[in-house]
Amino acid sequence: AFCNLRMCQLSCRSLGLLGKCIGDKCECVKH
């Protein structure tokens, strides 16, 4: 598995968060 940054950002944006790839994981962080 690998992190797709664009998909990560989109899914996090719907939560009002910023998407970042950490290794192969998507992390949602506050702006």
From Swiss-Prot:
GO terms for MF: ion channel inhibitor activity; potassium channel regulator activity; toxin activity
Residue numbers bearing the Histidine amide modification: 31
Expression (tissue specificity): Expressed by the venom gland.
Cysteines engaged in disulfide bonds, as pairs: 3-21, 8-26, 12-28
Protein keywords: Amidation, Calcium-activated potassium channel impairing toxin, Disulfide bond, Ion channel impairing toxin, Neurotoxin, Potassium channel impairing toxin, Secreted, Toxin
Main location as per UniProt: secreted
Residues under site feature: Interacts with KCa2.2/KCNN2 and KCa2.3/KCNN3: 1-2, 7, 24
GO cellular component terms, A-Z: extracellular region
Post-translation changes: Two disulfide bonds are the minimal requirement needed to produce a nativelike and bio-active conformation in this toxin. The third disulfide provides an additional contribution to structure stabilization and can modulate biological potency depending on its position and the structural regions involved in biological activity.
Lineage top rank: taxon: Eukaryota
Coiled-coil intervals, chain numbering: none
Subcellular location: Secreted
Region of interest: [R/K]XCQ motif: 6-9
Primary role: Blocker for the small conductance calcium-activated potassium channels. Shows the best affinity for KCa2.2/KCNN2 (Kd=0.2 nM), followed by KCa2.3/KCNN3 (Kd=1.1 nM) and KCa2.1/KCNN1 (Kd=325 nM).
Free-text note on domains in this protein's UniProt record: Has the structural arrangement of an alpha-helix connected to a beta-sheet by disulfide bonds (CSalpha/beta).
Protein family (similarity comment): Belongs to the short scorpion toxin superfamily. Potassium channel inhibitor family. Alpha-KTx 05 subfamily.
Note: A mutant [R7diaminobutanoic acid] has been developed that discriminates KCa2.2/KCNN2 (Kd=3.8 nM) from KCa2.3/KCNN3 (Kd=2500 nM).
The protein, known as: Potassium channel toxin alpha-KTx 5.1
